[in-house]
Curated annotation (Swiss-Prot):
Belongs to the universal ribosomal protein uL14 family. Binds to 23S rRNA. Forms part of two intersubunit bridges in the 70S ribosome. One of its GO terms (molecular function) is structural constituent of ribosome. The keyword Ribosomal protein applies. The keyword Flavoprotein does not apply. It comes from the Bacteria. Keywords: Ribonucleoprotein, Ribosomal protein, RNA-binding, rRNA-binding. It holds the Pfam family Ribosomal_L14. This is Large ribosomal subunit protein uL14. GO terms for biological process: translation. Part of the 50S ribosomal subunit. Forms a cluster with proteins L3 and L19. In the 70S ribosome, L14 and L19 interact and together make contacts with the 16S rRNA in bridges B5 and B8. It comes from Helicobacter pylori (strain J99 / ATCC 700824) (Campylobacter pylori J99). InterPro entries: Ribosomal_uL14, Ribosomal_uL14_bac-type, Ribosomal_uL14_sf.
Length: 122
């Protein structure tokens, strides 16, 4: 469950290491984001010479959350960290690699490029 001011790890090689959620997109008063949701975030930690610089405002999609996700079959899925992937204007990932597992709910949100780059889909 991601809300404003939540800090997330970045699960790609775009150059950012940590971001902070500014706004959850999708509706006028949407408070929480889950896996597959698009958020607006600010880059709080970045590596030098990366594609994404410190302080840049970016759109990201959440790929892992500590809060469990209930599937239709009754099973629960949760991860060890909150993580997101940075998107460009065409909703494709900025980075060329994805690190760590990605939840299957990202596929249902139609981010197929992220699913194809991910090493593991849970």
């Amino acid at each position: 469950m991601i809300q404003s001011f939540t800090r997330l790890n970045v699960a790609d090689n775009s150059g950012a290491k940590e971001i902070m959620c500014i706004k959850v997109l999708g509706g006028s008063h949407k408070r929480y984001a889950s896996v597959g949701s698009v958020i607006v975030a600010s880059v709080k930690k970045a590596i030098p010479n990366g594609k994404v610089k410190f302080g840049l405002v970016v759109k990201t999609v959440v790929v892992r959350t500590k809060k469990e996700i209930q599937r239709k079959n009754g099973s629960l899925v949760r991860f060890d960290d909150n993580a997101a992937v940075i998107l460009d204007a065409k909703k494709d990932p900025v980075g060329t690699r994805i690190f760590g597992p990605v939840s299957r709910e990202v596929r249902y949100a139609n981010f197929m490029k992220i699913i194809s780059l991910a090493p593991e889909v849970v």
